[in-house]
């Protein structure tokens, strides 16, 4: 699955593309980021 160019909301790293991290300071506002 290709990585989306936009940051998408997530709950865990599994929601993100491979090699991306689920990051955020609040539980409701976590986003996928590329390392």
From Swiss-Prot:
Positions of the record's site feature: Reactive bond: 5-6
A GO CC term attached to the entry: extracellular region
Subcellular location per the Swiss-Prot or TrEMBL entry: Secreted
Pfam family, one: Squash
MF (Gene Ontology): serine-type endopeptidase inhibitor activity; toxin activity
Coiled coil: none
Disulphide-bonded residues: 3-17, 10-22, 16-32
Gene3D superfamilies: 4.10.75.20
Keyword annotations of the record: Disulfide bond, Knottin, Neurotoxin, Protease inhibitor, Secreted, Serine protease inhibitor, Toxin
Family matches, as InterPro entries: Prot_inh_squash (IPR000737), Proteinase_amylase_inhib_sf (IPR011052)
Tissue specificity of this protein: Expressed by the venom gland.
Domain commentary: The presence of a 'disulfide through disulfide knot' structurally defines this protein as a knottin.
Functional note: Neurotoxin.
Family in the record: Belongs to the protease inhibitor I7 (squash-type serine protease inhibitor) family.
Protein name: U14-ctenitoxin-Pn1a
Annotated source species: Phoneutria nigriventer (Brazilian armed spider)
């Amino acid at each position: 699955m290709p990585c989306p160019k936009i940051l998408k909301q997530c709950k865990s790293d599994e929601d993100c593309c491979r090699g991306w991290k689920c990051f955020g300071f609040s539980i409701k506002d976590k986003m996928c980021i590329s390392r």
